[in-house]
């Protein structure tokens, strides 16, 4: 494959179909695993903190818990550079459009971790008229970390769960080639 062909996504998709049709699905699966390994070990987080869970989140950067050992050390101030947003605290109706815009500005693939009972279900403020009953009403959530506030150990466990989720995702869109003779795999299925 010539270098200039890498600029065109359609050419790459056709090349993948050709590889898949010729039985090179093992190579694609291994490349998928390699890319997912790299993505899961170099996640750039963005913190959207509105209350006390954000204060507890700061413990992760200290020496005792040190979330840099999991590859999460490069925190970002811009959603355009972040892979995951940690939503910590109560979200009121006035903050909902801000959170939605922040999520929309993130590049794909993007992940969301709801941190604490306020972000998950409204927490102790759930009976208030201005509180949203969980951020999953606004944006899709990948990992929920309960607690008021959750301990740093629970936050690290949630980060590990998200890394596991990233490792099993398909980076390449594999074509549906169930019509090819001798191909027993369905779309998205791996050997």
Curated annotation (Swiss-Prot):
Q: Which reaction does it catalyse?
A: a quinone + NADH + 5 H(+)(in) = a quinol + NAD(+) + 4 H(+)(out)
A Pfam family matched in the record? Oxidored_q6
InterPro entries per UniProt: NADH_UbQ_OxRdtase-like_20kDa, NADH_UQ_OxRdtase_20Kd_su
| Binding-site list for [4Fe-4S] cluster | 52-53, 118, 148
Molecular function in Gene Ontology: 4 iron, 4 sulfur cluster binding; iron ion binding; NADH dehydrogenase (ubiquinone) activity; NADH:ubiquinone reductase (non-electrogenic) activity; quinone binding
Q: Does the keyword Chloroplast apply?
A: no
**Alphabetical list of Gene3D superfamilies matching this protein:** 3.40.50.12280
Cellular compartments per GO CC: plasma membrane; respiratory chain complex I
The UniProt keywords, alphabetically, are: 4Fe-4S, Cell inner membrane, Cell membrane, Iron, Iron-sulfur, Membrane, Metal-binding, NAD, Quinone, Translocase, Transport
Query: Does Acetylation show up as a keyword for this record?
Result: no
Q: Give the record's membrane topology.
A: Peripheral membrane protein
Class of the enzyme per the UniProt entry, highest EC level? translocase
UniProt record, GO biological process: aerobic respiration; electron transport coupled proton transport
Q: How is the cofactor bound?
A: Binds 1 [4Fe-4S] cluster.
**Where does the record place it?**
Cell inner membrane
EC number, as in UniProt: 7.1.1.-
Cofactor(s) the record lists: [4Fe-4S] cluster
Family membership noted in the UniProt record: Belongs to the complex I 20 kDa subunit family.
**Function of this protein?**
NDH-1 shuttles electrons from NADH, via FMN and iron-sulfur (Fe-S) centers, to quinones in the respiratory chain. The immediate electron acceptor for the enzyme in this species is believed to be a menaquinone. Couples the redox reaction to proton translocation (for every two electrons transferred, four hydrogen ions are translocated across the cytoplasmic membrane), and thus conserves the redox energy in a proton gradient.
Subunit structure and binding partners: NDH-1 is composed of 14 different subunits. Subunits NuoB, C, D, E, F, and G constitute the peripheral sector of the complex.
Q: Mind telling me what this protein is named? A: NADH-quinone oxidoreductase subunit B
**Organism for this UniProt entry:** Azobacteroides pseudotrichonymphae genomovar. CFP2
């Amino acid at each position: 494959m010539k270098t200039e062909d890498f600029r065109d996504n359609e050419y790459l998709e056709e090349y993948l179909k050709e590889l898949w049709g010729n039985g090179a699905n093992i190579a694609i699966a291994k490349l998928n695993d390699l890319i997912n390994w790299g993505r899961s070990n170099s996640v750039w987080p963005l913190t959207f903190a509105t209350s006390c869970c954000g204060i507890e989140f700061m413990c992760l950067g200290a020496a005792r818990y040190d979330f840099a050992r999991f590859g999460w050390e490069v925190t970002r101030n811009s959603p355009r550079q972040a892979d995951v947003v940690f939503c910590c605290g109560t979200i009121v109706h006035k903050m909902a459009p801000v959170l939605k815009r922040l999520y929309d500005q993130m590049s794909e693939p993007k992940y969301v971790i709801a941190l604490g009972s306020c972000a998950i279900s409204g927490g102790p403020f759930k009976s208030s008229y201005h509180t949203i009953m969980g951020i999953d009403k606004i944006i899709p959530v990948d990992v929920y970390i309960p607690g008021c506030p959750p301990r740093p150990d629970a936050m690290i466990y949630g980060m590990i769960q998200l890394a596991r989720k990233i490792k099993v995702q398909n980076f390449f869109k594999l074509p549906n080639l169930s019509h090819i003779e001798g191909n027993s795999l369905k779309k998205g299925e791996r050997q």
